């Protein structure tokens, strides 16, 4: 697995990138083209597997680009949202929840009451 970190800078409409710890570099007229060139440059140094990359602007004229080659897993992203239960009885459940919250708040208030006024 290879990890390639690049520091990217824009000057005069041209983006340049130099590897943070290494000799790889590239330049292009846009960040899109620069990213494509950097991925190809990294692949020429290490072609051991799949490619993941991340481009982050630090300021309007500087950025960090990281290319990860290999590493196995494809980093799946799973976003699960609980579906709301439909049907009758929703009002009763909401009322029960409010009662539980009220009891919890009352017990928290009782826990913090030590019988003296700190600011009085």
Swiss-Prot record:
Which InterPro entries does UniProt cross-reference here? Ribosomal_P1/P2, RPP3
Is Ribosomal protein included in the keywords of this UniProt record? Answer: yes
An example of a Gene Ontology cellular component annotation for this protein is: ribonucleoprotein complex
A Gene Ontology BP annotation from the UniProt entry = translational elongation
Q: Which gene encodes it?
A: RPP3B
Keyword Ribonucleoprotein in the entry? The reply is yes
Q: Tell me which PANTHER family the record gives.
A: 60S ACIDIC RIBOSOMAL PROTEIN P3-1-RELATED, LARGE RIBOSOMAL SUBUNIT PROTEIN P3Y-RELATED
GO molecular-function terms, A-Z: structural constituent of ribosome
Give the protein's function.
Plays an important role in the elongation step of protein synthesis.
Native source organism of the sequence: Arabidopsis thaliana
Task: Give the UniProt family note.
Answer: Belongs to the eukaryotic ribosomal protein P1/P2 family.
In this chain, the stretch annotated as Disordered covers: 81-120
What HAMAP family does the entry give? Answer: Ribosomal_L12_arch (MF_01478)
Descriptive protein name: Large ribosomal subunit protein P3y
Keywords associated with the record = Ribonucleoprotein, Ribosomal protein
The biased composition feature labelled Gly residues covers: 81-92
Q: Where is the composition biased (Basic and acidic residues)?
A: 97-106
């Amino acid at each position: 697995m290879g990890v390639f970190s690049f520091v990217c800078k824009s000057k005069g409409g041209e983006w340049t990138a130099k590897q943070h710890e290494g000799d790889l570099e590239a330049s292009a007229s846009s960040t899109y083209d620069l990213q494509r060139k950097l991925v190809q440059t990294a692949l020429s140094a290490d072609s051991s597997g799949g490619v993941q990359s991340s481009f982050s602007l630090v300021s309007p004229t500087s950025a960090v680009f990281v290319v990860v080659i290999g590493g196995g897993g494809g980093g799946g992203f799973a976003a699960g949202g609980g579906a709301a239960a439909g049907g009758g009885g929703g009002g009763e459940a909401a009322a029960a929840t409010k009662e539980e919250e009220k009891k919890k708040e009352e017990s928290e208030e009782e826990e913090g009451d030590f019988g003296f006024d700190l600011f009085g």
